[in-house]
């Protein structure tokens, strides 16, 4: 399978730079996995598509203000993008600079360069940075950090992004990108879903900056997936098994929820799914055997990205590419602040040949 098999033409004008005024007012393209049939509507139509007893699984990670600006004490501007908080004082980060800092280099961070930090070690593409400050990493980031908007949102971050680029149920700080399918859920919609009898559960996957890295190989089987930390606690496992037992569906809100659930299923030894607290490098592309997820709420993804590959493995390659072609023709809004899809699983997708 070639990366170019997942390419499609996308006019620049369809990339959303701001969200809709109301979270749940975006458009919704529904794709019936088995048949490929498409239905156009609005996000609140989800209420009619879910049944009492269905289980929605959300990712409750919270985006941290992970982008820092400053300079090396020796001179030279730098941009730091936190990949992971290691503890209260240390981070793994990507550092953009004309010349990469060496271990021991002193960094002056923040618009007023008031925060002192030291680059202590390098681990491949990542730099280990230690803050020389009384405050915790999270407090420092909340004080001087910028929201890490994706590279395709071509504007500086604004104060409003601190809430707009968060789900309303975000709880555990640690992500450097939002699980964007969840951005469309507001409290009124969540309340209506609960009133209908739809069950809800929460996994945690701290989305890393690697989610925006392009696939740099020609053959997708050669791609090495970035690592992210995920938690699937016992209460989620119980909710999944109970939903399956009563004949209801497990509906993942976002690809990060998919990756969390399917990672927990892959690692399970005795049951369909078991608790999971670990890093995951799961790479889902056509040919993957889904074990847990029956339906998916997701945004529109970048051409040639690992996420459009995940969707193709779920709905079928041809159905997915046809849906994206229709979305472009109908001028849906793309990417993080864009519109959404509701997709049901296509059990025949695993047998489909791509690029032959």
Swiss-Prot record:
Signal peptide: none annotated. Keywords: Cytoplasm, Queuosine biosynthesis, S-adenosyl-L-methionine, Transferase. GO terms for biological process: queuosine biosynthetic process; tRNA wobble guanine modification. Its main location: cytoplasm. One of its GO terms (cellular component) is cytoplasm. It is found in: Cytoplasm. It is an enzyme of class 2 (transferase). GO terms for molecular function: S-adenosylmethionine:tRNA ribosyltransferase-isomerase activity. Its EC number is 2.4.99.17. The keyword Membrane does not apply. It catalyses: 7-aminomethyl-7-carbaguanosine(34) in tRNA + S-adenosyl-L-methionine = epoxyqueuosine(34) in tRNA + adenine + L-methionine + 2 H(+). NCBIfam families: PRK00147.1, queA. Belongs to the QueA family. Transfers and isomerizes the ribose moiety from AdoMet to the 7-aminomethyl group of 7-deazaguanine (preQ1-tRNA) to give epoxyqueuosine (oQ-tRNA). Monomer. This is S-adenosylmethionine:tRNA ribosyltransferase-isomerase. The lineage of its organism: Bacteria, Pseudomonadati, Pseudomonadota, Gammaproteobacteria, Enterobacterales. The gene is queA.
